[in-house]
Amino acid sequence: MKHYAIQPANLEFNAEGTPVSRDFDDVYFSNDNGLEETRYVFLGGNQLEARFPEHPHPLFVVAESGFGTGLNFLTLWQAFDQFREAHPQAQLQRLHFISFEKFPLARADLALAHHHWPELAPWAEQLQAQWPMPLPGCHRLLFDEGHVTLDLWFGDINELTSQLDDSLNQKVDAWFLDGFAPAKNPDMWTQNLFKAMARLARPGGTLATFTSAGFVRRGLQEAGFSMQKRKGFGRKREMLCGVMEQTLPLPCSTPWFNRTGSNKQEAAIIGGGIASALLSLALLRRGWQVTLYCADEAPALGASGNRQGALYPLLSKHDEALNRFFSNAFTFARRFYDQLPVKFDHDWCGVTQLGWDEKSQHKIAQMLSMDLPAELAVAVEANAVEQITGVATNCSGITYPEGGWLCPAELTRNVLELAQQQGLQIRYQHQLQDLSRKDDGWLLNFAGDQQATHSVVVLANGHQISRFSQTSSLPVYSVAGQVSHIPTTPELAKLKQVLCYDGYLTPQNPANQHHCIGASYHRGSEDTAYSEDDQQQNRQRLIDCFPQAQWAKAVDVSDKEARCGVRCATRDHLPMVGNVPDYDATLVEYASLAEKKDEAVSAPVYDDLFMFAALGSRGLCSAPLCAEILAAQMSEEPIPMDASTLAALNPNRLWVRKLLKGKAVKAG
């Protein structure tokens, strides 16, 4: 999946106020009564009113081939809300809607189109508020405290469905085959699409479409659906409905990156920082019973304990996986934090990354050449930096207007309090010593001869993750760093944005009139003692990067206020999220992987043991989406990420890449 800005819809509104695509010369919905047509064709054609009360699972998954104005989604959301109100004790509690859109509407056009349906306004306004920026890939939107999830995939549906992870196979309960008419948009209505629909459909899953075109009916039958005609809506004579009445054989395309979940719904999380806090929320939302074990006497005493941390994406022209992950993680994080019903100090003031030397200027120029949407990142010339940031630096750079800063410690503490209100159990001063399989679960041995057993375990304990026999071979490393807390000055108080250079400097937090400046970097160290050298170096790096800035020289670190923490990182700068891989079994099973890919078995992992680690210095950006990915995987639900990016997050990735090339693998 190439990283490029998605092209917005090219449309106009006709005399009836209906949006019409200029490119496809077709309406987005019926001039007569688009809302009733949606109810008849898609909700009625899939028999959803009758199926919801009898659905045997807590989640119902709908997929759609063209999002357009979101009419189908909004109509279904309204119907689902009405169902939940009428059937509060039903097994079905959550709706998951997956849709693909090559040319998404601009937010203003979306709002204008929604004026047609005032009865949908309560739902339409929520969609407009979370409408994502035009970036390729999956945008997960959470509504109604997670009872409704929308996965919006921006890009060509035929390309995107070929890039979906195998974990989405046979997950879709109902398909809405929608879009511009086949005669207007033949490129979408392909046999490849029909085959993808069949691959994703659950046995017994259904489909409905407004068209009755013969090639569509025959193509869906060839793909595996049993098809029938039904009376069309209004003046349309016929439409098509279908059922997946068979279980298609679906071999795993990349078994070495296969992800497995669990049906046990009970887990222990080891940790006490932002990763474990956000994962707790994500699992509780899915009905899990969760117990958190924290080694310290309180949360956020490790790497998540800083006063201020910057939120902005990590981009690189030469690393597609990095771009795909962090651009979508960043936009998800902003939506997630804005929705969180907890208080924490933050300011979405923007982040400006400056080119202080030739190397950093070249890196920024490469990022700006990637055709990024202006909502994500824009160039800023040296003479405009002072106006944007409030301070003079004599450097040009790149600005992330949606970025900013937040207090990780406060966020972590308050998210855990929220999770406790939802049923989370927390055990402090529980230092995990080791874990082993017992019966159908895990036996946890803690310091002080304390024990516990759990069905599923997630290791989210930062740099301590590799201290167990199951994880000792993981290629992760510790990084100790010191952040200095400096009092504001009249000049520093002018700083309006987070500055990033060969370090970073935050605007003052109004709650304490202090800034954060940092951070030192000591790879392989776990030393958390205060360092006067680090304190001075944090100040000196700022001065060295902006030698003409008098305000930088006035930075005062003499009061020795600082915080030292230890991060867990990987050499490819991406987190490790998923099953804990079995190192020894991987080397045995994949000894001949380079020559025998076709014979490869599923990735050797420890059953019901997962990990959420190596967030590095971008945990505030990556943690919300990673928590959502892991909770979805564990719950065997659709994952909001394409297969190749998921592979880049797999904890076994560095070993497997070498084995695929026939190279030797070393532990650590």
UniProtKB/Swiss-Prot annotation:
Region span, tRNA (mnm(5)s(2)U34)-methyltransferase: 1-245
GO-annotated cellular components: cytoplasm
Function of the molecule: Catalyzes the last two steps in the biosynthesis of 5-methylaminomethyl-2-thiouridine (mnm(5)s(2)U) at the wobble position (U34) in tRNA. Catalyzes the FAD-dependent demodification of cmnm(5)s(2)U34 to nm(5)s(2)U34, followed by the transfer of a methyl group from S-adenosyl-L-methionine to nm(5)s(2)U34, to form mnm(5)s(2)U34.
GO annotation, biological process: methylation; tRNA wobble uridine modification
Record key words, sorted: Cytoplasm, FAD, Flavoprotein, Methyltransferase, Multifunctional enzyme, Oxidoreductase, S-adenosyl-L-methionine, Transferase, tRNA processing
NCBIfam families assigned: MnmC_Cterm, PRK01747.1-1, PRK01747.1-2, PRK01747.1-3, PRK01747.1-5, tRNA_MNMC2
Family: In the N-terminal section; belongs to the methyltransferase superfamily. tRNA (mnm(5)s(2)U34)-methyltransferase family. In the C-terminal section; belongs to the DAO family.
Cross-referenced InterPro entries: FAD-dep_OxRdtase (IPR006076), FAD/NAD-bd_sf (IPR036188), MnmC-like_methylTransf (IPR008471), SAM-dependent_MTases_sf (IPR029063), tRNA_MAMT_biosynth_bifunc_MnmC (IPR023032), tRNA_MNMC2 (IPR047785), tRNA_S-uridine_synth_MnmC_C (IPR017610)
Catalytic reaction list: 5-aminomethyl-2-thiouridine(34) in tRNA + S-adenosyl-L-methionine = 5-methylaminomethyl-2-thiouridine(34) in tRNA + S-adenosyl-L-homocysteine + H(+)
The name this protein goes by in its record: tRNA 5-methylaminomethyl-2-thiouridine biosynthesis bifunctional protein MnmC
Taxonomic source organism: Escherichia coli (strain SMS-3-5 / SECEC)
Cofactor(s) required, per the database record: FAD
